[in-house]
UniProtKB/Swiss-Prot annotation, chain A:
Residues at which Zn(2+) binds: 32, 35, 50, 53
Organism of provenance: Halobacterium salinarum (strain ATCC 700922 / JCM 11081 / NRC-1) (Halobacterium halobium)
PANTHER family registered for this protein in UniProt: TRANSCRIPTION INITIATION FACTOR IIB (PTHR11618:SF13), TRANSCRIPTION INITIATION FACTOR IIB-RELATED (PTHR11618)
Protein name in the entry: Transcription initiation factor IIB 4
Gene, per the UniProt record: tfbD
Region (Disordered) residue spans: 1-47
Curated annotation (Swiss-Prot), chain B:
Name listed for the protein in its UniProt record: TATA-box-binding protein E
Organism: Halobacterium salinarum (strain ATCC 700922 / JCM 11081 / NRC-1) (Halobacterium halobium)
The Sequence repeat ranges on this chain: 10-86, 101-179
Gene this protein is translated from: tbpE
PANTHER family: TATA-BOX BINDING PROTEIN
Record lineage: Archaea, Methanobacteriati, Methanobacteriota, Stenosarchaea group, Halobacteria
Superkingdom to which the source organism belongs: Archaea
InterPro entries cross-referenced by the UniProt entry: TBP, TBP_archaea, TBP_dom_sf
């Protein structure tokens, strides 16, 4: 009885995990409501306080972790209040049953030949039952595709989840007819990555997708308009850390590049310019200013923009940043 | 400060008409001097007029599209030339076939740099399309007049989709007043 109650509480807890997570991150974004200081979470006390003024922003926080301590794998399973979370990344939200492939019973003994054949038949029908109609088969393929591309980019689960939700909405609103599953899946991922401020450029996306850049761009515009995703224009600065680390440049360069981009935006020379090109040029310019050698060729390879673009932009960026007269 | 409306310049006018009978383009192409007809490239016959400068696309169905003219008058003028040419080939064309203007493309200049990022947010992301990765202009679709405006960082803009020259003026008026409201035109 008690056990059942805790189980229910537990599953409730899982559902609220994503919202909880997103709220925490917005807390961090906004900071303390009084003084805008950084928030500190004390997990022992379950309190969130402001590191500057000491204001308690949240108390009696909920611990979403499993019950008590567990000392071995068996106890961990017993004391866990939660099952696997539901996820939009699987076509059935991870709610279906899978029949294991091992042909062993609960004790680990090998099944008899008769049972083995039975499990084989059950497995076949389970698989057929899991994807009953074309919509589910469609979802299965698309979500698999999203998963594959997100892995290639090393995008976190939150982005994959968002991409999956965007795809589900597109499917629900009948945007698929006339467009390819791969195209819509790719643009869902592209949109999700941009919304999470970890944008991947269209060229990068096209390099792992099964459809070409033109189709991705077209489908993305269509999906974004129909679902009113309202994705803000990409901030060039969000590419900077990735380019810097790919080029093995120091944090100094990264900071300098951000400053240059901010100055360029203030000077109003970024309107209508490709964010990827701006980011690449600012990284190149910042590396020059901090005497770390990179060639335009290296930057252009990493950023997937042409050297000409970098050359054209970095002069403008240096001028706007008040650093004229620096030459390569 | 000059009024942006004074910088309005019509760049292209597209109009359609028809002569109400099917044509054998192959023989028309033979007889009509200066006509380009390559059915593998394009199913229509292209006939270019020099004064006013424009191109008329003549289709097998007898429908004619005239494009490239710089004003509505020019469209009528060049279509009149085309009709006369066809009459010379003893193709029957009634006196005044109806000419419908389909699209007018206009350019204008707001006279100062625009911060497209701020405009994108200000006009509302649901009303505009701004993808600097794909196209440097900001696409703004107006409901009244029903035109599409492309705004560029240089302050220049292109207005397309209008059916009459007045549409462009209204659009420029609307855009300037919207941007002034938002304080984005200093």
């Amino acid at each position: 009885m008690t056990n059942q109650r805790t189980t229910r509480d537990g599953s409730h807890g899982t559902e609220s995990v994503p919202t909880q997570r997103s709220r925490e991150s917005t807390d961090e974004d906004h900071g303390c409501p009084e003084c805008n200081g950084d928030l500190v979470t004390d997990e022992d006390r379950g309190e969130t306080t402001c590191g500057e003024c000491g204001l308690v922003v949240e108390e009696d926080g909920i611990d979403h972790g499993p019950e008590w301590r567990a000392f071995n794998a068996q106890e961990q399973d017993e004391k866990s209040r939660v099952g696997a979370p539901t996820t939009n990344m699987m076509h059935d939200k991870g709610l279906s049953t899978n029949i294991g492939w091992q042909d062993k019973d609960a004790y680990g003994n090998t099944l008899s030949g008769r049972q083995r054949r039975k499990m084989q038949r059950l497995r076949k029908w389970n698989e057929r039952f899991r994807t009953r109609n074309s919509k589910e088969r469609n979802l299965k393929q698309a979500l698999g595709e999203i998963e594959r591309m997100a892995s290639a980019f090393g995008l976190p689960d939150s982005v994959r989840e968002t991409a999956s939700v965007i795809y589900r909405r597109a499917l629900g609103e009948d945007l698929l007819p006339g467009r390819s599953i791969e195209g819509v899946a790719t643009s869902a991922l592209y949109a999700a990555a941009r919304q999470a401020n970890t944008p991947r450029s269209l060229d990068e996306v096209a390099s792992v997708s099964r459809v070409d850049r033109g189709e991705i761009a077209r489908t993305y515009r269509y999906v974004a308009r129909e679902l009113s995703l309202e994705v803000a224009p990409t901030d060039p600065a969000s590419y900077v850390p990735r380019f810097c680390s790919d080029l093995e440049l120091s944090g100094d360069v990264e900071r300098r590049a951000r400053d240059l981009l901010a100055a360029a935006a203030d000077a109003g020379i970024t309107s209508g310019k490709s964010p990827v090109g701006l980011a690449a040029a600012s990284v190149y310019a910042a590396a020059l200013l901090t005497n770390e050698r990179v060639t335009q060729n290296e930057v252009s390879t990493v950023a997937n923009v042409s050297e000409v673009t970098i050359r054209n932009r970095y002069h403008e960026i240096l001028d706007a940043g008040g650093e004229p007269g620096v030459e390569a | 400060m000059t009024d942006p409306k004074e910088t309005i310049n019509i760049e292209n006018v597209v109009a359609s008409t028809g002569i109400g009978q099917e044509l054998d383009l192959q023989s028309v192409a033979m007889d009509l001097e200066g006509a380009d007809y390559d059915p593998e490239q394009f199913p229509g016959l292209v006939y270019r007029t020099q004064d006013p400068k424009s191109a008329a696309l003549i289709f097998r169905s007898g429908k004619i599209v005239c494009t490239g003219a710089k004003s509505t008058d020019d469209v009528h003028e060049s279509l009149r030339i085309v009709f006369d040419k066809l009459r010379e080939l003893s193709i029957k064309v009634e006196d005044d076939p109806e000419i419908v203007v389909q699209n007018i493309v206009t350019s204008a200049d707001l006279g100062r740099q625009l911060n497209l990022n701020a405009i994108a947010i200000g006009l509302g992301l649901e009303n505009i399309e701004y993808e600097p990765e794909q196209f440097p202009g900001l696409v703004y679709r107006l409901d009244d007049p029903e035109v599409v405006a492309l705004l560029f960082g240089s302050g220049k803009l292109v207005i397309t989709g209008g059916k009459e020259p007045k549409d462009a003026e209204h659009a420029v008026d609307k855009i300037t007043s919207r941007l002034e409201e938002l304080g984005l035109l200093d």
